[in-house]
Amino acid sequence: RCRNGEHIVIICGNNAKIERILRKEFHFNKRVHIIGYTNHVSLFMDACDVIYTKPGGLTSTESLVKNIPIVHTAPIPGCETANLHFFGARHLSVSSKHLAKQVQLGKALIENDSLREQMSKAQRRERKPEAAMQIVSLLEQLVSHE
């Protein structure tokens, strides 16, 4: 429920079933926006005050690079569990498997400047903006030695 004028954007991707369910559930609420597949995820992320996402590698890393406070939801066992532990241990995100706690965590990140700044500082410390170029350089070196 939006109480303070905020808007909630839910991006469902290719999950048409969940998109249909959410559209039915929130059709009356003009502050809840249900989006299916979009090529504009980055733009929606730029507008975020906080992001709720499962701890997949792509969205989690992009959120870190964009310095968006992250609330991780329940992971899919395996790689996402490892991502959840990695991000949590470094204070790059907060998490809970329980919806009510996730809401509390997100509100705290929005309302508590100190908490948000602590996560932001950790994200700036851990991100590696030159990683892609370093990988390309390494690959070039490996290819030139063959």
Region locations from a protein language model:
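Conserved beta-strand positions in the Rossmann-like core of class I SAM-dependent methyltransferases
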Residues: 9, 71, 94
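C-terminal alpha-helical cap of glycosyltransferases
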Residues: 128-146
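Donor-nucleotide binding loops and adjacent catalytic segments primarily
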Residues: 1-48
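Active-site-proximal loop->helix
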Residues: 82-89
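C-terminal "capping" alpha-helix adjacent to the active site of nucleotide-linked donor transferases
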Residues: 89-94, 98-114
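A donor-sugar binding/catalytic signature common to diverse glycosyltransferases
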Residues: 41-82
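A short, well-ordered alpha-helix in the C-terminal region of glycosyltransferases
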Residues: 115-129
